Amino acid sequence: MSSSDDTSSDYDDYDDYELDEDDTEKEPSKWNNVRDGWQEFLEDETAFFVSQEDQSKQSGDIQIDDSNKFYDPLGILKLPPRKAASVKKELLSLESESFSPVTFLSEIHSQTNFTELSIGVKKLKEESTSKAKEIKYLVKENFEHFVKCKDTVDEVYNLISNSKMLEDMSGSFIKIINKSSTVYDPLLSNKKKADEIRKVLTLLNKYKVIFKLPGKIQENIKQNEYEKAVHNYKNAKTLITSSQKKEFQKILLDIEKIAEDFRIQLFHALADPSTKLEQLKKSIKTLMEIGNGKGDFSQIGDPCWYFLSTRYNAITLLIKQCSEDNTLPNYKIIRKLSILLLSNVPNLFKMGVYYIEGKFEDNKEYLRYKQQQQIQLQQQQQLIQQQQQLQQQQQQQQSGKTKDSKSVNVVVYYLDETFSSYRMDQEKKVKDLIELCRKRFIEEEDDEFCLYKLSEKKIKSEDKSTTTTNIKLLELSHDESPFKLQKKWADKNSSTKNHRFLFKRKNEEFTVNNSKAGNGTSIYDKEANITQIDLNASYKTHKKQNSAATSAMNEEKFKQLIINIMELYSSKVEQLFFDQNQEDFPEDSDDEEENLFDQIISTTSVNEDGNHHHGGGGGGGGGGGDTINSSDLSIHMVENVNEVIKCQEMLQGIGMPELYLSSINSLTESLILHFIRQICSEMVAEVSFLYLLEDWTINESSEDALASGNQVDGMITTRLMGEFVNTIKVNLAKLSFLSNKPMLLPSVESALCEAIESFGDCLHHLAFNNESIQSTIEDSLNQMSNDEKAENELNGIIPKIDISSPQQQQQQTQNQSQQGQVQQGENQQQQTSSYMTTEFNSSEKLLLTLSNCSTVVSKTAVQLRGFYVGLFHQPMGSYLKKVIEKLGVLERLILERYVNEKNLMIGEFITRGVLFSGSTWLVNSQPTKVSSFILTILTKMVFIHHEIMKTINSIDISFGVIQRIFEFLLISLRHNFSLVDPLFISNEGKSQFLLDILFIENVLESYGNEKTVKLSSFIRKDLLFLNPIQQQQQQQPTQSISHQHQQQSSTSRFYSTLNYGGGSGFNINATTANLDPILKRNIEKTSLLFSCFKI
């Protein structure tokens, strides 16, 4: 058999097979019937004669049938007219007894004129006369033959009737029949047996489908064709039960046994956690169709609820067992719980939705097969209709008469005061009219349109004063004919009752307010009683109410089931995440910073070469022994939080309502908040102690990602900047899942700003609280003192002579004693301090700290803000600007700290050079060169410039430092020169001081500003109005006053001299002109030394 036959056999129409045992062939069982038939034949007198009709039939079979050939007896027409086809031939044939002359003339010769008819009559008379003559001639010519035939017939009749020939023939036939019976009786009995066997085979072939059903059902089950198995099972029960044959009961028992095993298999599939969703749907749908049977699962009830409850019990048991596993750390248990939830709950929820809605999807292959059958049936119907139409057209063409289809105008009214008119014939139905009317509406998914018969009847009251209108709406069936209804209403023509068609949606209510006549007035009275009758309305309403109640109950049960699972999962995860007895996660405590401090210290190791190696910004390397790695803990926290968020998003993605997810939403929020606080606190704490990792290593390696990224204008930074940026980025990356939760970002932003500010604290600690930096001043002074002693010994310079006033000398003595005590204490501290590295001195470390601070202010803070925006897709607030402003203040403080240290060293040189250098300002010769202490100071400034460029390579910082030192240099020179006793100052001494000032101004010309210009003018005025006599008169007689009073007194003398406006004979302009050649000569000699100051 072909594959098509096999496929069709799976869905055979078993209704065609019936058990009919009376349907057998009837054949004679004995030859006695033949004998009886022969006797009857002999007794029949007409048996040997052939009737005239039979003879005409036999002759007609041999001859050509020309009865359809047209012949006009009048000889006028050769072709029949169209009207003749619809008239009976008996009425037109002259030889027929029912010939009608009127019909002949009206149908055949209706268009023939009178002249032709007259000629035809003559011809007809001639033919009649000639035919009579022919008959007479025939009889005359063959008269002898007629007489002989008559005599022969008489003789044959006498011979048969008078002789015994017929009896002898009858006896011979009887003998033949008896002998045939003897011979053929066994054959006939065998034939009867064969017929009985054939009948049994026929029945077996007819009901072979029933016998094959057990095997077919088993084959369908093996191939997972559950729909076919259910189809065959139901049809087998129908056929066997309707036949009521005991022979088929055994087959039915076998089928029931197979079905029971199939039910057990389906229930086991429902209880198996690895069963896929499609298989679950098929299993539940199959069980709902074939029932639970009579076995162990007969009392289960609804198979879908059995699956839901079984799966619920399995999930809750697994969650409890997993959460109580003490062999795994908490973060791994949380991971297993999340995997368990994601692998079971989605399928459980989807099946629950089908359970609530009370429907399951059908098998696509089975539906496709049914659709193909329907399409084939429709095609066959269309072919039949086309053939019928062709036949009708051919009949109409043959008859020459086309019948016009009758039709009527049908007016359909709508609720929006409009109506439509359609032409309907007898073949159109109500469903066709509905399709025409619904084209004017915009349909929605749930719309259902109906056509109603609107009947209106007015009833007068007994006193005939009021009239009540009764309106009745009757829904029309789709098979009714609008043509017949319209004709019926037109034929009645009743004045007391009106009918019309109304088209509307089924859920729309019909009221008298929305029914208006064409003129705008209401058709119905306000007292109209409206009754709407729908097809099967009461049954549909009852079914809808029961379905709604069942769905609500199922939804409540299933909702509680899902909520219980979510609450159990949330409680276990929260308990594991916040369990204080475990060491898997760090908890908030008062000693958190101290623990982190110890951890950072423990992760710092020194190799044999003295180079420090430490962990990255994310938490450092591993400690020793039992030390917990905070980086691993944070990673585990990130994984757990992401797993819980993934569970939440996946459950939301499958359409689970928020009511079901309330517990997991609360869990997610709690974990996220705790995780954010933990990560932010770790980030701030790590940044707070980064100064411990400062080993003053320069970012010179090209492999370092931050070697060029964090440098401003080519400034050099240390690897501490990389540690800082890595720490921030690593911790922020752990919070990347907050990109779609902008409401939680303010705390992260605040923590980022706090971390940047904490890094500023680290820089402040490195700049101001480091003991090695505190010793910078003393190191510089000691080195300067040693250099000067060596220089004096080599050059043979005379010892220092103090030319200051007695008060100033006493004050200097006190200052020296105090400085000696401070220096002794700091030296002791310096001996006890330890350094991580000796590669950079204290000044260079201070410059590197300044460079790091400038980098944070100028670039790193902006880069971190960009990283934050790119990571979370949210802008930052204005708090970061305030933090940058604070760091800018710190940058200026560090710069001033460095400048003050250098100014202190330069100020000591100025004090020694002006007051204690051993030279005198009371000379009589003109100056020839710049003072040596000025050259020493400028040389120190060259060293400062070189130190800045070598250490941090910053032109801006070097410019700012030199400019500030330049200002301090002028202020200090003016102040110290004002402390010199005027008795020891001559005009030549003033010229020497003016030469020094001019030399400094020319060398540092590029670093001048308004302040230096003012200071230079003040110095010139001091020299111009300095008068020794006035200085003596204003000197205080008492020498026991403090140094502060002395300074105020000298200042008052300076301003009193200015107020007098007198002069001492010293001309600034002339002196400057005289000193110009000497100045140029000294500048040329030192141009190479001070070339770094030329910008």
Curated annotation (Swiss-Prot):
Compartments reported by the entry: Midbody, Midbody ring
GO-annotated biological processes: exocytosis; Golgi to plasma membrane transport; protein transport; signal transduction
Segments of this protein annotated with the region Disordered: 1-32, 605-629, 804-835
Top-level lineage group: Eukaryota
Oxidoreductase in keyword set: no
Acidic residues composition bias: residue spans: 7-25
Gly residues compositional bias, start-end: 616-626
Listed GO CC annotations: exocyst; Flemming body
Biased composition (Low complexity): 807-833
Matching PROSITE patterns: RA
InterPro entries: Cullin_repeat-like_dom_sf, EXOC2/Sec5, EXOC2/Sec5_N_dom, RA_dom
Keyword Protein transport: yes
Keyword annotations: Exocytosis, Protein transport, Transport
Homology family: Belongs to the SEC5 family.
Role description: Component of the exocyst complex involved in the docking of exocytic vesicles with fusion sites on the plasma membrane.
Subunit field text: The exocyst complex is composed of sec3/exoc1, sec5/exoc2, sec6/exoc3, sec8/exoc4, sec10/exoc5, sec15/exoc6, exo70/exoc7 and exo84/exoc8.
Name under which the protein is recorded: Exocyst complex component 2
